[in-house]
Amino acid sequence: MAVKSLIRKCLFPAAGYGTRFLPATKAMPKEMLPIVSKPLIQYGVEEAMEAGISQIGFITGRGKRAIADHFDTSFELEHQIKGTSKEKFLDDIRYLMDNCEFVFMRQREMLGLGHAILTGEPMIGNEPFAVILADDLCAKPTEGGERALSQLVALYERYQCSIVAIEEVPADETHSYGVISGDEIAPGIYQIKDMVEKPKP
């Protein structure tokens, strides 16, 4: 069940080309790659809902129409499977469509992640918001714990400042990630002092 949150809006930057996933992403957005029975991006929207967020903004680019189509009604498909055993396979997506508000914004130029997020400013205004990168799937904890976004929302409500999820990476792979330095102020919680994008090992 979703919780009431100070953060009501979430952006999904989804305008990139998905070159790391070629050739699978040549004709399909990486956000629509299937994991078991759902596309990656649907897992992200479900995680946002679990964190109490119902206003979802997608920052898209050319060739990403499949994302909008996925979160919309397909009358032909619905008619074709109505009354059959396959109808239940649409229950999850129907629930999201009934309980979320979706906004689609076009990033006209590929100027990076920061620019993609800035493209969402008309929807966000001055409110606190979350950002989910759909190709970074965070699995649901196996023993009843909260998913990553719910943890981040709780930290925001506690500290009232920007919150970033971090993870340890091997030193020889830092050239592929943003890296932080900071002080641990509580178990697993760091106050960031500096952040560097893709430093050399």
Regions found by a protein language model. Name each.
Residues 183-201:
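A short, charged helix-loop
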Residues 76-80, 87-182:
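Conserved beta-loop-beta/alpha segment of the NTase-like Rossmann-fold superfamily
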Residues 6, 52-53, 125, 158, ...:
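Short loop/turn motifs at secondary-structure junctions
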Residues 2-88, 143-151:
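N-terminal glycine-rich phosphate-binding loop and ensuing alpha1 helix
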Residues 37, 107-109, 197-200:
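Residues that form or immediately flank small-molecule/cofactor binding pockets and catalytic motifs
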Residues 59, 132, 198:
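Conserved residues at the C-terminal ends of beta-strands
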